[in-house]
């Protein structure tokens, strides 16, 4: 299966990262440091959930002798690679806070649709039991990032529109090898994208508030 075939290129849409009127009412006003702390904690928790779900899927469905080969093939491409988002801490430190928030919002929003179907794929009682909460947690993190953008937008120039890479849905036919590899690839990309968001938020929080014990 060719890299990139897990996703539909027709689903790429241009998104304007404007915030809806009245959105502020859904997220309480609080000090900027608290907004960053809450966003970092949410991103950390989601990244942990993504990593645990990926490992449990691998342990349950992917034979051990095939994991290295499959990782090399399915991890070759994620749609998030089509946007100029920083790939690590050093790259992130070269971007402004507003740029990092825009990239974070794009990455989070790209997973909202597929994550609505995650719980329909994983019906057992393993770590997949948390999958029905992932969408809700993504929405919470989206609101947190939007709240930060509202706080900072008056001080930063508005950036260009970004392409929002929208991932395909998870495949429910787990008896198919192609479906297994597709879902394996999606979970790998989800884990990578959440790691990026967590890194961006930590970089912003550390440099803005001068924390001496930052772990990124």
Swiss-Prot record:
Gene3D superfamilies: 1.20.1250.10. GO terms for cellular component: extracellular space. Zn(2+) binds at residues 45, 198. InterPro entries: 4_helix_cytokine-like_core, Somatotropin, Somatotropin/Prolactin, Somatotropin_CS. Pfam families: Hormone_1 (PF00103). This is Somatotropin. Its main location: secreted. Belongs to the somatotropin/prolactin family. Keywords: Disulfide bond, Hormone, Metal-binding, Secreted, Signal, Zinc. Induction: By growth hormone releasing factor (GRF). Residues 1-25 form the signal peptide. CDD domains: somatotropin_like. GO terms for molecular function: growth factor activity; growth hormone receptor binding; hormone activity; metal ion binding; receptor ligand activity.
């Amino acid at each position: 299966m060719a890299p990139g075939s897990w996703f539909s290129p027709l689903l790429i849409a241009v998104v304007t990262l404007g915030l809806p009127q009245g959105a502020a009412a859904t997220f309480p006003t609080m000090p900027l440091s608290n907004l960053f702390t809450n966003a970092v904690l949410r991103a950390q928790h989601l990244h942990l959930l993504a990593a645990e779900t990926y490992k449990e899927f691998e342990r349950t469905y992917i034979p051990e002798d095939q994991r290295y080969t499959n990782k090399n093939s399915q991890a070759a491409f994620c749609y998030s690679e089509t946007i100029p988002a920083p790939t690590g801490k050093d790259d992130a430190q070269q971007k402004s806070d507003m740029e990092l928030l825009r990239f974070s919002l794009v990455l989070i929003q790209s997973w909202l649709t597929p994550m609505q179907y995650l719980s329909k794929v994983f019906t057992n009682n393993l770590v997949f039991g948390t999958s029905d909460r992932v969408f809700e947690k993504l929405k919470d993190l989206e609101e947190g990032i939007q709240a930060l953008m509202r706080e900072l937008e008056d001080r930063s120039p508005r950036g260009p529109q970004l392409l929002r890479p929208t991932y395909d849905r998870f495949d429910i036919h787990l008896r198919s090898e192609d479906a297994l590899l597709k879902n394996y690839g999606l979970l790998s990309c989800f884990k990578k994208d959440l790691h990026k968001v967590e890194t961006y938020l930590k970089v912003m929080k550390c440099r803005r508030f001068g924390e001496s014990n930052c772990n990124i």
